[in-house]
């Protein structure tokens, strides 16, 4: 029996996963990087230090790996770089060398899209939205035999990502970081107000809605209404991006991934409006399951 390792070290999670020859995820371990109370996040050097400390807590032991796939950059575009992914590449190389395994350099975005493909049947050409704390991308994806061959970015945020919008508003409301789950709970009792986002073709700006909402909070808007307003704005923006991408490309199939897609209200609204598919909730946050799956598929294709 052969086994396939995926490793991802993102801004806030250390992750390892193992797939077997049949493509089943048989091991999935993640450890969040702890953000001290009152802080809005961590610096890159703090993230790298924490990954180094806790990678041993998530690393699977006792598996003879045939292939290892790791995220070596945030996205599949020139100039995409973060120090945390350099650390991930180094650990992955050591794991591959120790096992005599093949080594595949992929990206954090590959991992999210591949994780979303687990349990979702998609055509070989589809639209993918990667929506997280650091990314709000609209992409055209080409795959073959379960392998992502090409990711083309069609549009992105021109300033902050959807997840940053959530966290900045959450921090202003005094909820713990990361703020997504807390805002989703608050929004259940809130009434949303409309915010206007600015679009440039398939690019979007969230800074305007953020500023407008922070002003409303300063004037006394309740936490519940503010949380509901964030959700409403993000869902509306993503629906518009999907429609623009479908019109531009002629591609109808859509798959959404990333931590923001853990929000059940947002996903329900998008599904109702567009018929899009989503990563399973357990695969929406940062994880290494998609990378393990790709390691298996790439290895099998090469045999």
Question: Where do the model's predicted regions map?
Answer:
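Glycine-rich beta-strand-to-loop/alpha-helix junction loops that act as flexible
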Residues: 70-73, 132, 254-263
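Conserved active-site "lid/cap" helical segment
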Residues: 13-72, 216
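Active-site nucleophile and cofactor-binding loops and adjacent substrate-binding regions
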Residues: 82-87, 103-111, 129-131, 159-160, ...
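A short helix-loop
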Residues: 2, 9-10, 17, 26-28, ...
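Short beta-strand-loop/turn "lid" adjacent to the catalytic site in phosphate-handling enzymes
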Residues: 57-93
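Glycine-rich phosphate-binding/hydrolytic loop that grips phosphoryl groups
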Residues: 112-115, 279-303
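Conserved phosphate-binding catalytic cores of ATP/NTP-utilizing and phosphoryl-transfer enzymes
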Residues: 1-2, 101-127, 293-297
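A contiguous, well-structured pocket-lining segment that forms one wall/lid of small-molecule binding clefts
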Residues: 181-254, 260-277, 296-303
């Amino acid at each position: 029996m052969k086994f396939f390792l995926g490793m991802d070290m993102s801004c806030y999670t250390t992750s390892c996963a193992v797939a077997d020859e049949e493509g089943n995820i048989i091991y999935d371990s993640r450890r969040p990087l702890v953000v001290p109370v009152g802080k809005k996040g961590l610096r890159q050097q703090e993230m790298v230090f924490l990954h180094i400390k806790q990678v041993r807590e998530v690393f699977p032991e006792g598996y003879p790996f045939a292939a290892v796939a790791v995220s070596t950059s945030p996205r599949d575009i020139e100039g995409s770089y973060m120090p945390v992914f350099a650390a991930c590449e180094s650990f992955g190389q050591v794991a591959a060398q120790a096992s005599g395994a093949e080594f595949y350099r992929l990206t954090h975005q590959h991992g999210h899209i591949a994780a979303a493909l687990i349990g979702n049947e998609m055509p070989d050409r589809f639209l993918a939205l990667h929506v997280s704390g650091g990314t709000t991308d609209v992409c055209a994806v080409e795959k073959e035999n379960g392998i992502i061959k090409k990711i083309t970015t069609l549009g992105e945020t021109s300033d902050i990502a959807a997840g940053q919008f959530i966290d900045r508003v959450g921090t202003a409301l005094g909820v713990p970081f990361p703020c997504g789950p807390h805002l989703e709970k608050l929004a259940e009792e809130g009434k949303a107000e409309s915010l206007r986002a600015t679009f440039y073709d398939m690019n979007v700006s969230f800074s305007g809605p953020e500023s407008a909402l922070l002003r409303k909070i300063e004037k006394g808007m309740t936490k519940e209404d503010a949380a509901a307003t964030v959700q409403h704005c993000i869902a509306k923006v993503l629906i518009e991006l999907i429609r623009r991408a479908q019109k531009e490309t002629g591609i109808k199939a859509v798959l959404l991934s990333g931590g923001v897609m853990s929000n059940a209200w947002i996903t329900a609204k998008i599904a109702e409006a567009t018929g899009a598919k989503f990563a399973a909730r357990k695969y929406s946050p940062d994880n290494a399951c998609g990378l393990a799956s790709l390691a298996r598929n790439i290895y099998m294709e090469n045999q």
